Regions:
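Short alpha-helical "patches" and their helix-cap loops
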Residues: 57-64, 152-161, 282-283
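Conserved ATP-binding subdomain of kinase catalytic cores across diverse folds
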Residues: 1-99
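C-terminal catalytic region of ATP-dependent kinase domains
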Residues: 35, 161-283
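Short, surface-exposed helix-loop/turn micro-motifs enriched in polar/charged residues
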Residues: 35, 58, 128, 148-150, ...
């Protein structure tokens, strides 16, 4: 799916699960690497700070081109992936799977109904009473934090194994953290907090009905989740330390993520975290 160059590969010395190798796309404007590779790796590790299960990501190089490899979320040949559009269509026969853009039927409420008989992922440390939707609401909370705009209905899935159905770990997070911006614009936003705030407030998901802002979308999902899980995700977000965030971002080499980009991502995460916490407590 998608237009990115990618192939399934095996990595010797690791387990038998395949890895999806995805080349970082080049910017049409000047041929520079767009940054999806560092964004996907960074989001994978940020997700771990709040307990979101994700596909394992490793940096890679193919014939001199930057890339990442993403480990399959399927554990063996007895498991299959049923993507969100199929899950929603099974619950709602009139659901339009062909829409490439805003889908009025794609809402948190519809997803909650579609996941009613689905178990949460096995990769977890959350309380045992979490439902699959409670975890999925956590995915949207993470999206809002990292400015992830690509949670379309094929960008989440259910793992099928015999009669068992479980929500898959989150995957495909390259469209996040302002990866597409140039350093010149990042610096302007760092110099002008109001400019940066306008930028983050424009962040929206164009696939859900109504094309909601990312923070509003997260609030909507959290509002439909059980109270315990809702508090769990917000508490996890609230307890993240600046040192933990810096540790993740500092691990990206400066040859890949410039100092300006590093500071921009740190500031972006701090602002979105505050918007989520302050906005929800005041709603």
């Amino acid at each position: 799916m998608g237009s990115k160059e990618k192939w399934w590969v095996e990595l010797p010395g690791l387990d038998d699960r395949p890895w999806l190798l995805k080349l970082a796309r080049l910017d049409d404007r000047d041929g520079t690497v767009s940054g999806e590779d560092w964004a996907e790796w960074t989001v994978h590790h940020l997700a771990g700070l709040i307990g979101i299960p994700t596909a394992t990501i490793r940096p890679a190089v193919l014939e001199g081109r930057r890339a990442i490899v993403s480990q399959s979320v399927l554990h063996d040949r007895f498991e299959y992936l049923d993507h969100g559009n199929s899950v929603l269509s099974a619950k709602f026969p009139d659901y339009d799977q062909s829409t490439d853009g805003e889908n009025p039927g794609y809402t948190p409420a519809a997803v909650r109904e579609a996941l009613a008989e689905v178990a949460p992922p096995v990769e977890s440390d959350w309380p045992t009473d979490f439902t699959a939707f409670d975890v999925w609401a956590g995915y949207l909370t993470m999206d809002a934090w990292v400015a992830g705009r690509d949670r379309h209905d094929q960008n989440w899935a259910v793992v099928l194994r015999g009669d068992e159905r479980r929500l898959a770990p989150s995957f495909d997070h390259g469209n996040a953290l302002g990866f597409q911006e140039r350093d010149e614009r990042r610096q302007r936003m760092l110099d002008d907090d109001a400019h940066l705030r306008r930028w983050v407030e424009r962040g929206a998901n164009r696939y859900f009905g109504g094309q909601p802002g990312l923070v509003d979308l997260a609030w909507s999902a959290l509002g439909l989740a059980s109270s315990g899980p809702r508090d769990f995700w917000l508490d996890r977000l609230d307890t993240i330390t600046d040192d933990a965030v810096h540790s993740v971002i500092s691990a990206v080499p400066r040859s890949i993520m410039s100092d300006v980009t590093h500071r921009f991502v740190v500031r972006l995460l701090a602002m979105n975290r505050r918007r989520l916490l302050d906005g929800y407590s005041g709603s």
